[in-house]
């Protein structure tokens, strides 16, 4: 096992906050594997790269020799996490949650070593709690303290309803740490309240409190809003290799180091070397290619990554993609047909030309030929090619934010 200092450096890489660092140092000094917990509510069937920020951190703990607990919130998933939500989330059925959980497992083991991963379901202990146990759990926290949460506070002050079961969510997540005897819990920055709940409940149940490590929410392809499937600015880990590759090669230069730090398994020394190369005049696109190849290989294999790179090279030969793509913005109130976006971005003379190019296969989005059915999602960014000479990295921004 690495020294405490070496472990701490890797643990803190890319992290937003570590609470409490001195406590974690003491735990590491014992020289025993720690129990590292991260919970995921399977509320959708597939994962994107934003979800993998936590999973990557779990892998780093795993490589350091610690015990990883991948917690599937099949019980909490039926409640729905209220964190950051302005309204009550519709609950899922147990069947939906379990179906999604199976797809999660197949995806996360592309990152985690299944032989060294403990998979747990929080229904295992939550289903065993008696009404008296639930009353005891609920008595550990007050409504006033719950309303200190920013999202609950905003909803309460704006007279929006808060269902009683939503108050249970952070209590159940916190109790998971009690049931698992977690030493460390990972979560996004939006989960801090819930993670701290775990510390408080562990104390209440006579356990040593866990340390918490919050990780930032990964920005989407637009480099502004967090990665989200609903915003369309995401890279799905089950997307076709060519699509994943083209999306990653097309990210803004300003975003690539963030992605390297949070998504790459390269050492920080190697990443610093790539930064130095870039500052010395290396083409940023060549650096992004390294990132794209690494991530495509992780989820699809080395051969698929090589094929994606080769296909992208062939596409470039057909219509050379310039190194200095112009950054273009189009304001809109809602999603927009690709023909209208090309016209407003100035990549075609008029909408009629756009329609002709689309009909003849002359329009590529992120390297892939598209037709007139392609819809540009509000808030997303794509590399657009109209014909052989018109290129641009186009972002569809809301009219409100452009004012």
UniProtKB/Swiss-Prot annotation:
This is Tyrosine--tRNA ligase. Belongs to the class-I aminoacyl-tRNA synthetase family. TyrS type 2 subfamily. Its EC number is 6.1.1.1. A motif ('HIGH' region) lies at residues 42-51. Pfam families: S4, tRNA-synt_1b. The keyword Ubl conjugation does not apply. Catalyzes the attachment of tyrosine to tRNA(Tyr) in a two-step reaction: tyrosine is first activated by ATP to form Tyr-AMP and then transferred to the acceptor end of tRNA(Tyr). ATP binds at residue 229. Homodimer.
């Amino acid at each position: 096992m690495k020294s405490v200092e070496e472990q701490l450096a890797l643990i803190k890489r890319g992290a937003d906050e570590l609470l409490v660092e001195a406590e974690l140092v003491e735990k590491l000094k014992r020289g025993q594997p720690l129990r590292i917990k991260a919970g995921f509510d399977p509320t959708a069937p597939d994962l994107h790269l934003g979800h993998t920020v936590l999973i990557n951190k779990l892998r780093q703990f795993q490589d350091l020799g610690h015990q990883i607990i991948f917690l599937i919130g099949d019980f909490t998933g039926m409640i729905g996490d209220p964190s950051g939500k302005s309204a009550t989330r519709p609950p899922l059925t147990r069947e939906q949650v379990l179906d999604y959980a199976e797809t999660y497992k197949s995806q996360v083991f592309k990152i985690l070593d299944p032989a060294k991963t403990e998979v747990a379901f929080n229904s295992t202990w939550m289903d065993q709690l008696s009404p008296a146990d639930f009353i005891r759990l609920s008595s550990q926290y007050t409504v006033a303290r719950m309303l200190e949460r920013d999202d609950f506070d905003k909803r309460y002050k704006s007279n929006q309803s808060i269902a009683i079961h939503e108050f249970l969510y952070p209590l159940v997540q916190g109790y998971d740490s009690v049931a698992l005897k977690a030493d460390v819990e990972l979560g996004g920055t939006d989960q801090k309240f819930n993670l701290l709940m775990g510390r408080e409940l562990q104390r209440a149940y006579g356990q040593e409190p866990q340390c918490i490590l919050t990780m930032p929410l990964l920005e989407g392809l637009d480099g502004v809003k967090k990665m989200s499937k609903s915003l369309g600015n995401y890279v799905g880990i089950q997307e076709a290799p060519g699509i994943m590759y083209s999306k990653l090669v097309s990210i803004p230069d300003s975003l690539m180091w963030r992605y390297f730090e949070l998504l790459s398994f390269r050492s920080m020394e190697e990443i610093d070397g790539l930064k130095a190369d870039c500052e010395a005049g290396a083409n940023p696109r060549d650096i992004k290619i390294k990132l794209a190849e690494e991530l495509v290989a992780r989820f699809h294999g080395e051969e698929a990554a090589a094929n994606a790179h080769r296909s992208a090279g062939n596409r470039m030969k057909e219509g050379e993609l310039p190194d200095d793509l112009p950054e273009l913005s189009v304001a809109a109130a809602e999603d927009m047909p690709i023909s209208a976006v090309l016209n407003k971005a100035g990549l075609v003379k008029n909408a009629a030309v756009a329609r002709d190019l689309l009909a003849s296969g002359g329009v590529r989005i992120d390297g892939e030929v598209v037709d007139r059915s392609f819809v540009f999602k509000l808030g997303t960014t794509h590399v657009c090619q109209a014909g052989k000479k018109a290129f641009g990295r186009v972002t569809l921004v809301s009219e409100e934010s452009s004012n």
